[in-house]
């Protein structure tokens, strides 16, 4: 039903959300929130101050009701006007893109460079792996050498190679008597 078909009494008793829906259906274009409020005041024949108390609830209802969609910049429309793909395009701000330059030989060389760089990385990783394996071999050799040194040290403990000569007790007594 068109807004023109409603009586003034019916428009006064109509909920704000239903009235907004009818306004959008008749206009068939997006409207800013303030324009929507002005049109509602005009249709219901009330003062804008009379609507102020219900404005917050109306805005909430407009957001919740699935028939309406916010298009940004306080513009609203009916969801049925926009296919899903177009909604995303219209709602999201336009992204400025730079014009693509034609590929040059430098771009081709750059692509080759990427391949070379990848090959070098693989070679470096293989070298690192070889070094780790070599380190493991060295660690085993070091462990064997350390064990041999420990055994040699234990054998050396039994010998007296501190450079001191041993003196018998008898020799001590003789030295003391001479003094």
Swiss-Prot record:
What is a GO molecular function of this protein?
DNA-directed RNA polymerase activity
Domain HTH HARE-type: start-end pairs? 14-81
Similarity field: Belongs to the RpoE family.
The UniProt subunit note reads as follows: RNAP is composed of a core of 2 alpha, a beta and a beta' subunits. The core is associated with a delta subunit and one of several sigma factors.
The record's region (Disordered) falls at 108-179
User: What is this protein for, i.e. what is its function?
Assistant: Participates in both the initiation and recycling phases of transcription. In the presence of the delta subunit, RNAP displays an increased specificity of transcription, a decreased affinity for nucleic acids, and an increased efficiency of RNA synthesis because of enhanced recycling.
Q: Name it.
A: Probable DNA-directed RNA polymerase subunit delta
Q: Which GO terms describe its cellular component?
A: DNA-directed RNA polymerase complex
Q: Which UniProt keywords apply?
A: DNA-directed RNA polymerase, Nucleotidyltransferase, Transcription, Transferase
Bias-annotated ranges (Acidic residues):
109-179
Gene Ontology terms describing biological process: DNA-templated transcription; regulation of DNA-templated transcription
């Amino acid at each position: 039903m068109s807004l023109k078909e409603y009586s003034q009494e019916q428009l006064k008793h109509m909920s704000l959300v239903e009235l907004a829906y009818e306004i959008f259906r008749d206009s068939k274009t997006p409207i800013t929130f303030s324009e929507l409020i002005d049109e509602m005041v005009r249709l219901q024949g009330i003062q804008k101050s009379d609507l102020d108390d219900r404005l917050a609830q109306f805005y909430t209802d407009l957001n919740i009701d699935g028939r309406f969609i916010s298009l940004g910049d306080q513009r609203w429309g009916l969801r049925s006007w926009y296919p899903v793909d177009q909604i995303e395009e219209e709602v999201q701000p336009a992204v400025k893109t730079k014009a693509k330059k034609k590929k040059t030989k430098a771009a081709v060389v750059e692509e080759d460079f990427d391949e070379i760089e990848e090959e070098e990385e693989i070679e470096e990783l293989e070298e690192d792996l070889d070094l780790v394996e070599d380190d493991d071999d060295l660690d085993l050799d070091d462990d064997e050498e350390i064990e041999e040194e420990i055994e040699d040290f234990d054998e050396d403990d039994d010998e007296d190679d501190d450079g001191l000569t041993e003196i018998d007790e008898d020799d001590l007594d003789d030295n003391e008597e001479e003094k």
